[in-house]
Amino acid sequence: MLEVWKKWNVRGVVQGVGFRHFVKNVARAIGVRGYVKNEDDGSVTIVAGGNDEQIKELFRRIMEGNGWSYISDYDEIDLPKQEYKDFHVEF
């Protein structure tokens, strides 16, 4: 299957609410690789790779949130293949 890589920068209530660990747990559960990272401006960056279905499922779950997070806006960029072996939180 063709590998898809996306970079999302999400804004809203996404820091201080367990969002990064939520994203990490969802990504690992569905087999996506990459990372999630808090940014200084209060947004969160997510780089994720997997097959098309995995990426769509991750995005759907991210937009649903963890019950405390709320995404008001986001940017999406297609990326070339990245070399991550797992999904982790970057600091």
From Swiss-Prot:
InterPro entries with a match to the protein in the record: Acylphosphatase, Acylphosphatase-like_dom, Acylphosphatase-like_dom_sf, Acylphosphatase_CS
Assigned EC number: 3.6.1.7
GO molecular function annotation: acylphosphatase activity
Active site location: R20, N38
Catalytically driven reaction(s): an acyl phosphate + H2O = a carboxylate + phosphate + H(+)
Gene name linked to the record: acyP
Acylphosphatase-like domain segment(s): 5-91
First-level EC class: hydrolase
Keywords from the UniProt entry: Hydrolase
Family label: Belongs to the acylphosphatase family.
UniProt name for this protein: Acylphosphatase
Organism whose genome encodes this protein: Fervidobacterium nodosum (strain ATCC 35602 / DSM 5306 / Rt17-B1)
